[in-house]
Amino acid sequence: MSTTAVPSAAVQKQLKQGKVKKGIFSVIRHLVLALLAFIWLVPIAWLLLTSFSTDKGINFTRFVPENFTMWNYVSIMTQPDSVAQFPRWFMNTLVVACFNCVISTCFVLMVAYAISCCRFKGRKLLQNLSVTVNLFPGVLAMIAVYFVLKYMNLTNSYAGLIMVYAGSSGLGYLICKGFFDTVPVALREAAKLDGASEARIFFQIVIPMSRPILVYTIINSFLTPWTDFVMAKMILNSGVSTDWTVAIGLYNMLQKALINSYFSRFCAGGVLVAIPISILFVIMQKFYVEGITSGAAKG
């Protein structure tokens, strides 16, 4: 006849105290996360609400506008003036982002494949060197980059801006490398036995299997020029408003002489800039998350 041991009163008390402590920590953790979410969401909500305000300038007395209108969106999209050239800025940014998306994606995937799947002399040294370089912020090289572009007559040009974005993209290969490390070696070896070159293995075997990391790389490559202000401001410094990107144009609307007339339109522009990125994330969210998690697993 089997008997079941009954926990002593002391053990039961310890278990109860452990559950209470765990519950308290869980409540505190969720409260902290809720506070952080609130702090993060309030400026976004204010930007969105202000974009529908009938007031042209900043109104600190109200969080929710007294009256709502779509005029700010209509004005910034269909009525460009000497200050607000939003449709032109949007197209300039879109062109730079699309070109950089294609070039940077190719660079990142090729570098990641070479480091992950190819064995050559100096591979480890190159990998460690790239990781070390990534530890330093890109702004440290701004002056050198500017003078190089000036020497090549590429300042105030989209080609120079794209070159800067694409040229630095290859160093962000680590997540992609982690994903390529999970591709079975047997597949590549079988392809080599059939006479396939490294290029054919890369384009016909590895890339079709790498849709999550491909989406992740495409989104990141598109986001870099879409949200960048510092490099764009440094390179596109001619003062001609029609040559600006969205970030520079919207920043210009916050000048002291303009902010009381253009702030609500600035908010509308901020919302419009976020729409393409939001749609991109909603459509490709599944692949984006898969690319991060699978790439970080071994990377």
PLM regions and their residue ranges:
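Short, intrinsically disordered terminal tails adjacent to the first/last structured region
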Residues: 1-12
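A structural signal for multi-pass alpha-helical bundles of membrane permease subunits
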Residues: 6-8, 18-21, 25-299
